[in-house]
Amino acid sequence: MSQNQEISKKEQYNLNKLQKRLRRNVGEAIADFNMIEEGDRIMVCLSGGKDSYTMLEILRNLQQSAPINFSLVAVNLDQKQPGFPEHVLPEYLEKLGVEYKIVEENTYGIVKEKIPEGKTTCSLCSRLRRGILYRTATELGATKIALGHHRDDILQTLFLNMFYGGKMKGMPPKLMSDDGKHIVIRPLAYCREKDIQRFADAKAFPIIPCNLCGSQPNLQRQVIADMLRDWDKRYPGRIETMFSAMQNVVPSHLCDTNLFDFKGITHGSEVVNGGDLAFDREEIPLQPVGWQPEEDENQLDELRLNVVEVK
């Protein structure tokens, strides 16, 4: 066997493992939050970025073996940004045989009119886009709206709200839409961004840049993202532990009177969640909670994944 053939086999092996991991992560999120039910029509919001492409690919994969029946319809919002390649998504989706709808709305013109030059337009653009997607979901008869936010997005939002908003508020894997009519789901909630990036590179998705509008990036979010990436590099397992913490909230040991009845504590009240452990020595695990090193972690970094199809 030649060296090139050996490398190709390793690439294929690692890509298969990567897809299985993403599939497992998505499957667990769907099960934990009851994201998809029998007969659901899922509107998959496709932006042309790595996250939404990966979400569509994994949902299509799960659809083939899921114990329930559900359908997918991909939706892209063409916001009339200069240079937007209108042909890319239709060609890609037609090749896959996926039902889709391209919604054309000149939100770019509205945003440029309302936001001063050089300012971040993402907030207004997001609000406009959200309203259009809700309307489209109604028109298509969709029961769920799937967005491509992943675990890193959720953690970034948590820290943004803590650092700048004074709230412990993240990005829920499942929620009711602002108009009270649609259920929004985030199937990639348990997926790592670096896994999604590797998968997108390997599959050679036709990525559409997200900066066509010319808007400046959200500086605060970028600072948080850089901080989390640095932590992940220097302290393996810290990201996993923080995400686990979001799933293990103890209201009695925080300070929110809306979540726990502190005023109701009187003599004779029972001990809740271990009582006062503030001055006790905590038993700190040797490894971060929720973290298991991937056996192929180094291999995935070393190998260039260029296999397009997973058998």
From Swiss-Prot:
tRNA-binding recorded as keyword: yes
EC number of this enzyme: 2.8.1.-
Primary localization: cytoplasm
Pathway: tRNA modification
Gene Ontology cellular component terms for the protein in this record: cytoplasm
GO molecular function, one term: 4 iron, 4 sulfur cluster binding
Chain sites annotated for binding [4Fe-4S] cluster: 122, 125, 213
Subcellular location: Cytoplasm
Record's keyword annotation contains Ribonucleoprotein: no
Keyword terms of this UniProt record: 4Fe-4S, ATP-binding, Cytoplasm, Iron, Iron-sulfur, Magnesium, Metal-binding, Nucleotide-binding, RNA-binding, Transferase, tRNA processing, tRNA-binding
Superkingdom, natural source: Bacteria
Residues annotated as transmembrane: none
SUPFAM superfamilies: Adenine nucleotide alpha hydrolases-like (SSF52402)
BP term (GO), one: tRNA thio-modification
Swiss-Prot/TrEMBL cofactor(s): Mg(2+); [4Fe-4S] cluster
Gene3D superfamilies, alphabetized: HUPs
Motif residue range(s): PP-loop motif: 47-52
Free-text remark on how the cofactor is bound: Binds 1 [4Fe-4S] cluster per subunit. The cluster is chelated by three Cys residues, the fourth Fe has a free coordination site that may bind a sulfur atom transferred from the persulfide of IscS.
InterPro entries: Rossmann-like_a/b/a_fold (IPR014729), TilS/TtcA_N (IPR011063), tRNA_Cyd_32_2_STrfase (IPR012089), tRNA_thiolation_TtcA_Ctu1 (IPR035107)
Catalysed reactions listed for this entry: cytidine(32) in tRNA + S-sulfanyl-L-cysteinyl-[cysteine desulfurase] + AH2 + ATP = 2-thiocytidine(32) in tRNA + L-cysteinyl-[cysteine desulfurase] + A + AMP + diphosphate + H(+)
Subunit structure: Homodimer.
Note: The thiolation reaction likely consists of two steps: a first activation step by ATP to form an adenylated intermediate of the target base of tRNA, and a second nucleophilic substitution step of the sulfur (S) atom supplied by the hydrosulfide attached to the Fe-S cluster.
Record-stated family: Belongs to the TtcA family.
Biological function: Catalyzes the ATP-dependent 2-thiolation of cytidine in position 32 of tRNA, to form 2-thiocytidine (s(2)C32). The sulfur atoms are provided by the cysteine/cysteine desulfurase (IscS) system.
Protein name: tRNA-cytidine(32) 2-sulfurtransferase
Species of provenance: Escherichia coli (strain 55989 / EAEC)
Classification of source organism: Bacteria, Pseudomonadati, Pseudomonadota, Gammaproteobacteria, Enterobacterales
Gene behind the chain: ttcA
